[in-house]
Curated annotation (Swiss-Prot):
It is a peripheral membrane protein. The lineage of its organism: Bacteria, Bacillati, Bacillota, Bacilli, Lactobacillales. SMART domains: AAA. It comes from the Bacteria. This is Energy-coupling factor transporter ATP-binding protein EcfA2. ATP binds at G40, H41, T42, G43, S44, G45, K46, S47. It is found in: Cell membrane. It holds the Pfam family ABC_tran. The gene is ecfA2. It comes from Latilactobacillus sakei subsp. sakei (strain 23K). Its EC number is 7.-.-.-. GO terms for molecular function: ATP binding; ATP hydrolysis activity; ATPase-coupled transmembrane transporter activity. Forms a stable energy-coupling factor (ECF) transporter complex composed of 2 membrane-embedded substrate-binding proteins (S component), 2 ATP-binding proteins (A component) and 2 transmembrane proteins (T component).
Length: 291
């Protein structure tokens, strides 16, 4: 299910003293099965764009096409339910939205709200708990008795239980330690790889952009400043710095090596890529005493 923005603009509180531009003339296609990262400094329009993906916001001008359905300024809110079932959104700190007495009931709430029979929704909850890496025993526990990382997994399981085709992630690893962040990103990569799920992620973690995304959109002042593959975007560190954006850790290290005289055939994005490129530049046998 492709998502297309056709000359989309959005104005906050139009006609009031608080009027502000959220998006301006966005033209963008997010292809089915892709993994897209939205990056930009605070206030660039990332979250505003994200909320158009499942019609939490409707465009002030232009058209958002989600699969076969169009969202325009005139679209009736009653027609948005199907879209919100197909496009699941994981907000920042989603664990704050947990409310049911047990984990199973909390996960089952979303599907039931969309008309899934209770018995089927409860079965989905069991399957989703396993999918997000939690033991079945947590189903009867209160979500508020779990650790912060477990609570976040429960909240994500609730979104996945609605069987969305597109998963929208707003800073999904915010507040997690490095191990928790790696596990969470591994879960999303598994969904993308094994189920072909389309993923759109807002993040400030450039390492995650380099390791997981296949397309990057850079937003600035409500518009698209640049888009391309991670390698294309991170190939110009000076431009990124001018936009108050950083580089992946590996790419930063490679830039330091370039200043020391090393050369690379392309921008290394991951540790494995950098190691392979450095290995090619070392004299044979220089990798260690065992070689």
């Amino acid at each position: 299910m492709d998502i297309t923005f056709k000359d989309v603009s959005y104005t906050y509180q139009p006609g009031t003293p608080f009027q502000g531009i959220g998006l301006k003339h966005i033209n963008l296609t997010i292809e089915s099965g892709s993994y897209t990262a939205l990056i930009g400094h605070t206030g660039s329009g990332k979250s505003t764009l994200l909320q158009h993906l499942n019609a939490l916001l409707k465009p002030t001008e232009g058209v958002v096409q989600i699969g076969e359905r169009q969202i325009t300024p005139e679209t009736n809110n009653k027609n948005l339910k199907v879209i919100r079932q197909k496009v699941g959104m994981v907000f920042q700190f989603p664990e704050s939205q947990l409310f049911e007495a047990t984990v199973q009931k909390d996960i089952a709430f979303g599907p039931q709200n969309f008309g899934v029979p209770e018995a089927e929704a409860l079965e989905r909850a069991k399957a989703m708990v396993e999918l997000v890496g939690l033991p079945e025993a947590v189903l009867e526990q209160s979500p508020f008795d779990l650790s912060g990382g477990q609570m976040r997994r429960v909240a994500i399981a609730g979104v996945l239980a609605m069987q969305p085709e597109v998963l929208i992630l707003d800073e999904p690893t915010a507040g997690l330690d490095p191990v928790g962040r790696r596990e969470m990103m591994g879960l999303f990569e598994k969904l993308h790889r094994e189920q072909g799920m389309t993923i759109v992620m807002v993040t400030h973690q450039m390492d995650d952009v380099a390791n997981y995304a296949d397309h990057v959109v850079v937003l600035e002042n409500g518009g698209i400043a640049k888009s391309g593959t991670p390698r294309e975007i991170f190939a110009d560190p000076e431009w990124l710095t001018s936009k108050q954006l950083g580089l992946p850790t590996t790419t930063q290290f490679a830039q330091a090596l370039i200043k020391k005289g090393f050369g690379f055939p392309k921008v290394p994005l991951t540790e494995h890529e950098l190691a392979a490129m450095l290995r090619d530049q070392l004299p044979q046998g220089a990798g260690g005493a065992n070689e």
